[in-house]
Structures are given as structure tokens and as C-alpha cells.
Amino acid sequence: MATPANQTGRITQVIGAVVDVQFEGHLPAILNAVETKNGNNRLVLEVAQHLGESTVRTIAMDTTEGLVRGQEVTDTGNPIMVPVGVGTLGRIMNVIGEPVDEQGPVANEGLRPIHAEAPTYTDQSTEAEILVTGIKVVDLLAPYAKGGKIGLFGGAGVGKTVLIQELINNVAKAHGGYSVFAGVGERTREGNDLYHEFIESGVNKKGGGEGSKCALVYGQMNEPPGARARVALSGLTVAEHFRDQGQDVLFFVDNIFRFTQAGSEVSALLGRIPSAVGYQPTLATDMGALQERITTTHKGSITSVQAIYVPADDLTDPAPATSFAHLDATTVLNRAISEKGIYPAVDPLDSTSRMLSPLIVGDEHYQTARMVQQVLQKYKSLQDIIAILGMDELSEEDKIAVARARKIERFLSQPFFVAEIFTGSPGKFVELADTIKGFRAICEGKYDHLPEAAFYMVGTIEEAVEKGKKLAAEAA
């Protein structure tokens, strides 16, 4: 039975983000949104615990400075509701669906609750199809599934957000689909930059409306933990609406680790006993509740790309380790590769995808990917010998393998459209067939005569040949 709405209660205690509210003869359901006024602002509190017959403990979705005991609170009778529909495209909303871009109210096709059941087994679709991103290293070695979940793993400052921006740019242009971007606990400056870059690159129009392709839902670093723990669900709700209308939606989360981190803060505030490394005891449940809703149905698909910060570059930390279980593909960014100046700094041996199977991608693609990985693996295993004894001690066969591996490493780099501003190199979208052809030719030794530098920061193999000719002419 639905809770009768507009029941009022009074605040009895405020401790940071935790607010206790006492109702008279009425108890709001867990996860209900209750509202109060804080100055001129609407403050939404989400019910987290029942403390007695008529008292609830809530988590605030905004700062609680200025709240006083005895203040009136109203039960809305529903979970947090956010606006959905094409009116959200090009706009920035917060966790409770209010616009924060100063462009007026959000035009919507109704409101949806942020807590919902995952689609049933019978509603889910299981077809395997590849999403071509135009990024060589991704398409060749760890291809993304349409309607799959992709994890972008990397420490601080190795290029996760830039890779996400490039994916949004490439897929919006090549695919024409809608995207939803959930900014969870990341830098406000990055969120602001992203908003303006979308307008400059034509992904969105200022103020939203016709021609906009991406809805933004932000709960940044400075927000209380309640907002950061729920903003991913608000973004997902917007994406689910598009999917249910038959769209193929891209859902970006930057950063899923902050979702876990906020959950851990909320858990501590509610007095739960922490588990391993101080994380919440409900870590797997929280992650599962979010991830199971990101799926493809017979109506449409949600392909999700999730940036996953890896604390201290330790992949065995419970937060990234719990995320691994849900993913179809992983793109691991490696600091050692970014230090060589190779961007995107994707680790070709650590990144995986369940789509890399001859039954899905075909024999030629599969064999080329495996050849590339074998050459790189051989180079990796020889690195200790090279470091101690030098290249001269290697056999002729090994010398050739190392030379090819170094060319492959450089050919895995690529100029990005979204990085044009600070690299000066125009971005490249490389078709899958060109990617396969180029890497196969390098592995087979057709370009052994070209210098390594020719393969650095180019798109197709033809561009590498051109660059090689230029370098030869300059050296002459």
C-alpha cells in the first residue's frame, strides 16, 4: 500500500548529513523522500532507517547548515523523482532533478523514481554486437559490446576522463544516439569543462533542446555523501527512460569508485560496522543494485562506460574488485604507458573483453588481436634481459620481435578530437577494418623498414607510411 503523502513531522536531531525526523502516528517507508525548507532552498532527505514507531533517520541530499530542531518536514510518499525525456538533453541536473545550469526549468515527459527494479529475465536481450568506437587499441584488443558494461580502470591523472570525452564525441557523431553522463564525486572544474566542451564540439546546444545529444547529471566532490551515493541512480533513471522508448543509450559514469566511496561514508554515518579496508558491509549489494539495472531489453539498449579510479593503483582493492564482476570489457589505463607519452595509455595486455571471440568478431580480427598480444608479451618478457645486458645480447629473431613490438606500441597511440586544443594534432576516427589491416601488416613484417617514430600519433597505417617518408626526407 502506498504511503499517504503530505504527512508532516519535525526534526529532532541534526548531525552533519544525518537528520532524524519524528512523525505523529505515521512512518515513511525506507527510501522515501521527505522534504523541508532550508532558507529558500528545498532540502530533500532520504529515509534510511526506522528508529522507532514514528522516528526515521534520513540522509540529506544537500548541506544541512541552517536546519533547526522542531522544523517541519513533509513526507512526499515517493522515492526521489527526477525529470526524464528529451527535455533533459543538453541540461545539467543535480541528484534531485533540479537544473543547475541557470537555463530555466527542465522541460520533461514526466517524473520517474530513482529506485526501480531491474528488468526481468524475460525482458532482457542477449544478442552480441560490437560497438565501434574509432579508437584503435579499444576496437582491436578489447572491443565494447553494444548494451554491455565497460570499466575504465586507472589511477589519478592517466587519462580516464579524456577517454570518456572522446567516446562520447565519437559515438554521438558515428552513432547519433543519446548519451547520459553521471558525474559522481568528481571535480567541479572537470564537470564545467565537459559542459562547455560539449557545446563547443556540437554534442549539445546551450540551454538544451533541439540538437542536443547528452544529458548531464552531476553530484560533485563538494556535495554531501547522500547526493554522491544517489546521483548515479538519478542519471541511470534518465537513461532507462530513453531505453524504454527504443533508443540505444550510452550511459557514462565518472567515477564509479566515488559511488562506492559515498556509500561507505553513508554507511559509517548510519553506524554500520565496516568490512574489509573500511568499506560498507553492503558493498556488493549496492553495486549490484546499480549494475543490474544497466542492461539491454527488447525495447532498447544501455551501453555503459564507467571510469573506475583504482586507489593506489591496487586492482585488488574491494571497490574496483567488486566492479570487475559486472563488466563485459575492461580498459585498463597504465601509468607506465602514459609516462612513455603514449595516449590513450591503454594497457594492451591487461585490457580484456568477452567480445574478443572468433564467433563474435570473426577469425581475422581475433587472430590479429592475438598476434599483437603475443608480440607485446614477448617484448615484455625480454625487458629484464634488455635492461641488464642490452639489445645486443638478443637473438636476431628476438631483435625483430622487439622492433615490431615497439612499433605496435606506438601505433596503439592515436590523436583525439577532444585533445586537439592542447596537442595541436587533429583527431582521428579509425574504422575497424583499417585497424585490423594496419596491425596485421606490422606483425607480418611489412613495415619493418619504417622507423618507430612514423607510427606515433597517427590514425591509419597509410598515415604512418606518409609520416615515415616525411621523416626520411627531413633526415636526408
Swiss-Prot record:
Function: Produces ATP from ADP in the presence of a proton gradient across the membrane. The catalytic sites are hosted primarily by the beta subunits.
This enzyme's EC code(s): 7.1.2.2
The organism's taxonomic lineage, starting at the top: Bacteria, Pseudomonadati, Pseudomonadota, Alphaproteobacteria, Hyphomicrobiales
Pfam families membership: ATP-synt_ab (PF00006), ATP-synt_ab_N (PF02874), ATP-synt_VA_C (PF22919)
Binding-site list for ATP: G154, G155, A156, G157, V158, G159, K160, T161
Catalytic activity of the protein: ATP + H2O + 4 H(+)(in) = ADP + phosphate + 5 H(+)(out)
CDD domains per record: ATP-synt_F1_beta_C, ATP-synt_F1_beta_N, F1-ATPase_beta_CD
Enzyme class: translocase
Taxonomic superkingdom: Bacteria
Topology in membrane: Peripheral membrane protein
Protein name as catalogued: ATP synthase subunit beta
NCBIfam families (UniProt xref): atpD (TIGR01039)
Complex formation: F-type ATPases have 2 components, CF(1) - the catalytic core - and CF(0) - the membrane proton channel. CF(1) has five subunits: alpha(3), beta(3), gamma(1), delta(1), epsilon(1). CF(0) has four main subunits: a(1), b(1), b'(1) and c(9-12).
GO cellular component: plasma membrane; proton-transporting ATP synthase complex
GO molecular function, one term: proton-transporting ATP synthase activity, rotational mechanism
Organism expressing this protein natively: Rhodopseudomonas palustris (strain BisB18)
Family: Belongs to the ATPase alpha/beta chains family.
Annotated compartments: Cell inner membrane
InterPro entries documented for this protein: AAA+_ATPase, ATP-synt_VA_C, ATP_synth_F1_bsu, ATPase_a/bsu_AS, ATPase_alpha/beta_chains, ATPase_F1/V1/A1_a/bsu_N, ATPase_F1/V1/A1_a/bsu_N_sf, ATPase_F1/V1/A1_a/bsu_nucl-bd
Keywords: ATP synthesis, ATP-binding, Cell inner membrane, Cell membrane, CF(1), Hydrogen ion transport, Ion transport, Membrane, Nucleotide-binding, Translocase, Transport
PANTHER family given in the database record: ATP SYNTHASE, ATP SYNTHASE SUBUNIT BETA, MITOCHONDRIAL
